[in-house]
Curated annotation (Swiss-Prot):
Protein name (record): UDP-N-acetylmuramoylalanine--D-glutamate ligase
Keyword vocabulary terms for this entry: ATP-binding, Cell cycle, Cell division, Cell shape, Cell wall biogenesis/degradation, Cytoplasm, Ligase, Nucleotide-binding, Peptidoglycan synthesis
UniProt-listed Gene3D superfamilies: Mur ligase, C-terminal domain, Mur-like, catalytic domain, NAD(P)-binding Rossmann-like Domain
Reaction it catalyzes: UDP-N-acetyl-alpha-D-muramoyl-L-alanine + D-glutamate + ATP = UDP-N-acetyl-alpha-D-muramoyl-L-alanyl-D-glutamate + ADP + phosphate + H(+)
MF annotations from Gene Ontology: ATP binding; UDP-N-acetylmuramoylalanine-D-glutamate ligase activity
Subcellular location: Cytoplasm
Gene name tied to this protein: murD
Protein family per UniProt: Belongs to the MurCDEF family.
Pathway(s) per entry: Cell wall biogenesis; peptidoglycan biosynthesis
Organism, as annotated: Pseudomonas putida (strain ATCC 47054 / DSM 6125 / CFBP 8728 / NCIMB 11950 / KT2440)
Length: 450
């Protein structure tokens, strides 16, 4: 049996049958809303699941049919599909609303939302805030762009939602109405999808629509919403904090995480290393504080947090050299954070592995930090030559074809006291299934060194 295609206020089409698309299917079906599914791919990832669990739902695969899309009054568009897709634009011109799973989630969520975006660190900070809330005894649900799709989190007993949100998800979100929202930082990313940094910036800042409180990185002007008047604004940064601010204070030669003029805990008690991880901890404290969490359980969560996989994750020590997997550094900003954060935290130098699919980004910002902190850079992947041009003669450059070759070169180049860092500044899809596979293979190769 096929879903009726009679246009009505209750007919929707889910465009894109991946993880978030399948969560939309479950949500709409559970509420008895008539819908169909479309996907530009002939074999979308969740097609078998849809046909098994919802055989009555009509699904169209392949090129999008505008007339078909216009039979609905609202399209829920997958984050992976650009809104500039001609068929979507034509449907919108004919009066069809373009929306997404986060907009639908916001309409139905009954508990406060902590909303987190940014070019980098959003998964780490989202996880931290979730763990802080759990330590505080809250019934908390964590997800969005990280882990569980937002719609699958909806439940009547939840006391707090903590969501990681991408710019792609925010493009289809008109009014999130978060209790507290933040853009942790902004640097070039997804320039293959956006016309430039201003368009990317605008997409990120949709997170602030309807937010009752905001958290701002005071060391990144692009993270500040305009205007902030009329709602509480908390800040975080690596400099000393003042009113309504979290930061670092030095007391008797030791650095402390601090709120206003109150020291909270020594920075050395964090298990994760580097200034960027101190910044992440301060951001999480600011968000948790804005959401009403007490300091004691938040600090306990910080002391226990060992970091996420593929985010400056320690792999092994060999001959006095530590190896780190930062495969999640899929853009320049993330790689900069790792190079500067880890580089300042070790005795020796970094031997960096970089390269992959640069997504149209500009790499010149890497030159000075690489010159300061790196002994050498091993390059691989599609944009290795673009990286080489940007780095120039800052340090010796070695070009390789495979990740195994990169690991072998690093083993030869690194000296005792150094660290080998996989922080590619690029996406992985030119050579690997995803950044997780890239990180696993790096750790496997490093672990196999005699």
């Amino acid at each position: 049996m096929s879903v009726s295609l009679i246009a009505s206020d209750q007919f929707r089409i889910v465009v894109g049958l991946g993880k978030s698309g399948m969560s939309l299917v479950r949500f709409l079906a559970s509420r008895g809303i008539a819908f169909a599914v479309a996907d530009t791919r002939e074999q979308p990832p969740e097609l078998e699941t849809l046909r098994r669990d919802y055989p009555q739902v009509e699904v169209r695969c392949g090129e999008l049919d505008v007339d078909f899309l216009c039979r609905a009054n609202e399209l829920y568009v997958s984050p992976g599909l650009a809104l500039a897709t001609p068929a979507l634009q034509q449907a919108a011109a004919r009066g069809v609303k373009l929306s997404g799973d986060i907009e639908l989630f916001a309409r139905h969520a009954k508990a406060p939302i902590v909303a987190i975006s940014g070019s980098n660190a959003k998964s780490t900070v989202t996880t931290l805030v979730g763990e802080m809330a759990a330590k505080a005894g809250k019934r908390v649900a964590v997800g969005g762009n990280l882990g569980t799709p937002a719609l699958d989190l909806l439940a009547d007993d939840i006391e707090l939602y903590v969501l990681e949100l991408s710019s792609f998800q925010l493009e289809t979100t008109d009014q999130l109405n978060a209790e507290v929202a933040t853009v942790l930082n902004i640097s070039e990313d997804h320039m293959d999808r956006y016309s430039g940094l201003p368009a990317y910036h605008l997409a990120k800042h949709r997170i602030f629509r309807g937010a009752r409180q905001v958290v701002v990185n005071r060391q990144d002007a692009l993270s500040r919403p305009l205007p902030v008047e009329g709602r509480p604004c908390w800040t975080f940064g690596l400099n000393p904090p003042d009113f309504k601010a979290f930061g670092l204070r030095e007391v008797d030669g030791e650095k402390y995480l601090a709120f206003e003029f109150q020291t909270l805990m020594p920075a050395r008690e964090l298990k994760v290393r580097g200034a960027h991880n101190q910044s992440n901890a301060l951001a999480a404290l600011a968000l948790g504080h804005a959401a009403g969490l007490p300091f004691e359980p938040m600090l306990e969560a910080l002391r226990e947090f060992g970091g996420l996989a593929h985010r400056c994750q320690w792999v092994r020590e060999r001959n006095g050299v530590n190896w780190y997997d930062d495969s999640k550094a899929t853009n320049v900003g993330a790689a900069l954070a790792a190079i500067e954060g880890l580089g300042a935290d070790i005795e020796g130098k970094l031997v960096l592995i970089a390269g992959g699919d640069g997504k149209g980004a500009e790499f010149t910002a890497l030159r000075e930090p690489v010159k300061r902190f790196c002994r050498a850079v091993v390059l691989l992947g599609r944009d290795a030559e673009r990286l080489a041009e940007a780095l120039g003669d800052a340090v010796p450059l070695v070009r390789v074809k495979t990740l195994d070759d990169a690991v072998q070169q690093c083993a030869e180049l690194a000296q005792a006291g150094d660290a080998v860092l996989l922080s590619p500044a690029c996406a992985s899809l030119d050579m690997f299934k995803n950044f997780e596979e890239r990180g696993r293979l790096f750790a496997q190769a490093a672990g196999g060194l005699a």
